[in-house]
């Protein structure tokens, strides 16, 4: 369903365009030059779509046979614009088809002004301009060269396989190794420079080297303090054991002395 409706403020212009379209469609099919008579005869033969023909409609003089369709040679000229101060209608471009094809419809405006040879030249010029705009590869591409003999093949292989500098067998080139080492060292340096500010930031979660050092030092100090405390405790406990032993020895000596004294007293009493 189309929502568009033709404007009503330019009815003569619309009528002119409609008449032009009918003229062109007839010229594309038939070359009799009388589209009005041809269309009227067809309407009398097939009837008016949507209803019967009214009684007052003009006829073609009783001839119900339409004219024979002729070969379209050249399109008819454009009808004259209506008289009066009417807005100009769209211009008719081109001269229609050719002698071998069906005429009437225009060839598409500016395209009809070029011949076949002109189009080919134009396309070739555009292609050449596009090739000139394409940047050349740098360095230029090296295409393979055909080998004509075995000696030429061997010489080309030897030239391509010779190293730039002298190196030991089963090892790569010295310059290549040096370049790799330099590249790896540069990458390591970049990584260190990238992670060092992030690790030293106050709110960062990365482990810092200074923090690790502090924790290791604190652990070592705690261990040393524990060892010292244990040594002091052991030193304090040893004299106590010695005192206990001395007390036991003194008690044993006193008990032996008392037993000896008791024995002497008993012997003296027995002798008396």
Swiss-Prot record:
Skewed-composition ranges (Basic and acidic residues): 218-230
Region span, Disordered: 50-116, 195-272
Pro residues bias: start-end ranges: 78-90
Disulfide partners: none
Stored InterPro entries: DUF755, HEV_TT_vir_Orf2/Gyrovir_Vp2_N
Keyword Disulfide bond: no
Ranges of compositional bias, category Gly residues: 94-108
Composition bias, Low complexity: 249-272
Biased composition (Basic residues): 231-246
Post-translational note: Phosphorylated at C-terminal serines.
Keywords: Phosphoprotein
Pfam family, one: DUF755
Ranges in coiled-coil conformation: none
Highest taxon above the source species: Viruses
Protein's UniProt name: Probable protein VP2
Record lineage: Viruses, Viruses incertae sedis, Anelloviridae, Torque teno virus
């Amino acid at each position: 369903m189309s929502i568009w409706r033709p404007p009503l403020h330019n009815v003569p212009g619309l009528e002119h365009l409609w008449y032009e379209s009918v003229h062109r469609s007839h010229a594309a099919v038939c070359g009799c030059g009388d589209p009005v008579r041809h269309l009227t005869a067809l309407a009398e033969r097939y009837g008016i779509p949507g209803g019967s023909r009214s009684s007052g409609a003009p006829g073609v003089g009783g001839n119900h046979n339409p004219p024979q369709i002729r070969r379209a040679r050249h399109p008819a000229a454009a009808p004259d614009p209506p008289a009066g101060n009417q807005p100009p209608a769209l211009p008719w471009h081109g001269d229609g088809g050719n002698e071998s094809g069906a005429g009437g419809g225009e060839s598409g405006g500016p395209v009809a002004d070029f011949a076949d040879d002109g189009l080919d030249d134009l396309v070739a010029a555009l292609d050449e301009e596009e090739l000139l705009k394409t940047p050349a590869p740098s360095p230029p591409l090296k295409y393979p060269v055909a080998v004509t003999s075995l000696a030429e093949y061997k010489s080309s292989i030897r030239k391509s396989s010779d190293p730039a500098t002298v190196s030991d067998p089963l090892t790569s080139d010295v310059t290549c190794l040096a370049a790799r080492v330099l590249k790896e060292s540069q990458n390591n340096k970049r990584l260190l420079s990238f992670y060092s500010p992030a690790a030293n930031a106050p709110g960062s979660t990365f482990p810092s080297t200074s923090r690790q050092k502090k924790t290791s030092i604190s652990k070592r100090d705690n261990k040393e303090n524990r060892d010292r405390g244990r040594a002091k405790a052991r030193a304090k406990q040893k004299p106590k054991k010695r005192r206990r032993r001395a007390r036991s020895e003194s008690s044993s000596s006193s008990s032996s002395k008392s037993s000896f004294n008791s024995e002497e007293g008993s012997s003296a009493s027995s002798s008396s």
